[in-house]
């Protein structure tokens, strides 16, 4: 097991390949880590505003027990360069608003750019409650002077709905796209 346990979606293992964790150059990181003057890695996201309900099917096996994954291991990277800060996240299992709250606790303001999934993709149509969460998340993001690039696990219906609120503040991200972050 890894330092935080083994991760599963149902019965399917979705954690890091054990061959990778065995490599001598791989260093497990817990908590926050300043890598250098430009790179800062953080975890410790504890907020639960609009915590994605799709997380409920994700589990961790730790000390012989299978538990709901709390995503305390989820890490985000902040790249600081030329007076700008870019926040990079993966699927945002903790919820993008909670990740931004933690970022603001650490840095005292908003990032210039966020590159992240929003973990809103669904196989079934959204019900009214989920649509309200998408809208409220977009309204909250619109209050910040940040450009958001998302794709991946956000899902096209959620992206399109959020873009009606965020406009050019929300931009699509696809494999192979090159971002010129200097021009935002």
In which residue ranges do the predicted regions lie?
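Metallo-beta-lactamase
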Residues: 1-75, 167-184
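Cap/insert and terminal regions of metallo-dependent hydrolase folds
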Residues: 70-76, 80-175
